[in-house]
Amino acid sequence: MEWKIYKEEFDKKAEVKLEWLDSEFNKIKSGRPNPKILDHVMVEAYGDKSKLFEIANMQVVEGKQIVVKPYDKTLLHDINSAIQKENLGLSVQVDADSLRIIFPSPTEETRKASVKKVKEFSEQVKVEIRNIRKDVHHKIKDDKELREDELKWYEEDLDKLTREWNAKVDKAFAEKEKELMTI
């Protein structure tokens, strides 16, 4: 098989892992409001569950708040209940036609705990990338069509590809760590 096929398989699987990492990072509060922290909030609306961003507009205001304006004002209390159920440690104020979600300033201790959690997620993804590398490496070794020199070249490219994906994980970690530790 051609290297391109192995690379595409590796890239596709590694991209899924990086997307998962990004979604986990978005769930971690940094002290600055980010509407992505609410992406996974499911609201009971119209007899079905809907994602919050599908039924409301969200906007960061005053540097420490997110204002949630539902398209249908009758959903205010359902949205409030869904946010409270997520147990995100946020204060929610219900106004006449919107919700104000207030982000408390994190303490040094909570910032360090968040960085530790982010580091654990990053390490988990690196292990998963190594496992992807291992799977692809076995497929390369089992490929009877490859000559010895091609096998060595493929292995070198596989190692390079693994380093590139690990560098992406490291970059994502460094950015999130900086965001968390910035007061």
Swiss-Prot record:
GO MF: ribosomal large subunit binding
**InterPro entries documented for this protein:** Ribosome_recyc_fac, Ribosome_recyc_fac_dom, RRF_sf
One BP annotation, GO: translational termination
Q: Which GO CC terms are listed, alphabetically?
A: cytoplasm
Q: Where in the cell is it found?
A: Cytoplasm
Q: Quick check: keyword Nuclease in the entry?
A: no
* Similarity comment text for this entry: Belongs to the RRF family.
Stated name of the protein: Ribosome-recycling factor
UniProt lists the gene as frr
